């Protein structure tokens, strides 16, 4: 559970630490020492005497009592410094522990105490490797508003979210690897995107994960191998993979009107109230993604279609007649990164901007994305079922 910035309740029991990426520097203008502390977004000045000494001890290894005793600063100024740091989101005040959903953790007190005494985790090379790989992820998550444990709870919770990707384009393969590497362990390729008889072609080459030497290999077998290499957390066993998660999302990459299979699949998602997200095929240097549909609650594809017709948008008639194309290497990576970041924000529960909206992107104008929001249309009836 996170706290709001500024709501710090000091206690002698915790060991505060500066967030990853915080920098500080002592300056010496007339009138005494000051410390400038901040990050990429903003910085503040600390005027209290002994501020630099306190900052040097905010490593997460010293308790409040220890810092107070060693800093030799009055309690009022000490509390003022901590409150300022916490208000500006520069401070972590909780130390959460990564819980691996698919790794053994004993609930027997005697066994757990014995493992702790022997420092089993400190000698676990797999866990040490995981901690090294987690560092870049946590260093970004920790800067979100209200995060005060370094982002550990957020990234641990990603193991409880399920993503299924349908499609075999470069963007689909890139998204698959990004989500696995970002901690969404229950990421898989859907049955339409990964067939037993589907072989890797030159079309998929260029997604970083697949090489020219992989052409002709089984798409499903190769992706299974990649999952073990790129996944941040341990991959679930076959038994656990069959257990559906309460929170889930299906991502369809391609034209949903091209094949009866895909059209029927989306209709089935609507009937079963399964959340899904769409990514279009490239069209004349552009591509669009969205909406994220929560059937019965948010605008569906037909809601958007009716709205566009009423607005006189005739371009939608051309979208469904476009030939199947592949994105360039640069565009595939840029689009995949943008989409993955937005979906991860959705998974983490901090952003709902994908719901009921489409984003249009053109490779000739990378800084200008068009974001269009839609509402449930009364003529559609998707919310009446």
How should these model regions be labeled?
Residues 1-385:
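Adenine nucleotide-associated cytosolic modules
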